[in-house]
């Protein structure tokens, strides 16, 4: 009985040694995985409606959708918080935005450029 157990241990260790040897041989042949391409980021153009926070502006985005049955164009707006690192934008400016990683609880956009300053 004892010999059978030691024989089993010997075969297990031999198999483990063979596996280690195989992994060492596999190293040079292994090709690294290519990085996953980043998805396309959303970009929007809107108007600044508030700049009272530090490094944050509120931008109103307009969306026009044709009603499926009646054909009337319906205008909907939504307000988003945008990261403005240099606090360059002011109320009334037309700005370009890009979607980014979450910067705070409600901030997921960043300012790309100011397209037109308010008069």
Curated annotation (Swiss-Prot):
GO cellular component: cytosolic small ribosomal subunit
CDD domains the record matches: Ribosomal_uS17 (cd00364)
Region (Disordered), start-end ranges: 1-44
Entry's Gene Ontology BP terms: translation
Keyword set includes Ribonucleoprotein: yes
Keyword 4Fe-4S: no
Keywords recorded for this protein, A-Z: Ribonucleoprotein, Ribosomal protein, RNA-binding, rRNA-binding
InterPro entries: NA-bd_OB-fold (IPR012340), Ribosomal_uS17 (IPR000266), Ribosomal_uS17_bact/chlr (IPR019984), Ribosomal_uS17_CS (IPR019979)
Pfam families tied to this protein: Ribosomal_S17
GO molecular function: rRNA binding; structural constituent of ribosome
Gene3D superfamilies tied to this protein: Nucleic acid-binding proteins (2.40.50.140)
Family according to the record: Belongs to the universal ribosomal protein uS17 family.
Annotated PANTHER family: 40S RIBOSOMAL PROTEIN S11 FAMILY MEMBER, SMALL RIBOSOMAL SUBUNIT PROTEIN US17M
Subunit structure: Part of the 30S ribosomal subunit.
Functional description taken from the UniProt entry: One of the primary rRNA binding proteins, it binds specifically to the 5'-end of 16S ribosomal RNA.
Descriptive protein name: Small ribosomal subunit protein uS17
Organism of origin: Mycobacterium marinum (strain ATCC BAA-535 / M)
Organism ancestry: Bacteria, Bacillati, Actinomycetota, Actinomycetes, Mycobacteriales
